[in-house]
């Protein structure tokens, strides 16, 4: 059992994976859960919502590459700075990460 104020073990592991994703690459919420062998996309999303602010949160996205609602502008700035592959949008700025090109499967990939 965690001490009050201590980050739960699962949350700590999610944030460690998030921070290990190389610049320009992403994992989906489900990818993170699968990599850890624990939880699922919703559990990873909850961790990111509660404790992800100090991590590289923009590197964890929806499985379809869509940007985190409410954080699109900040995420796009990070993606452009890191050279993350984006899918063009006919209606203006890119609206998704190109998962085929940007997905990271874990260490050494």
Name the predicted role of every residue range.
Residues 1-109:
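Nucleic acid-binding interface residues in structured DNA/RNA-binding domains
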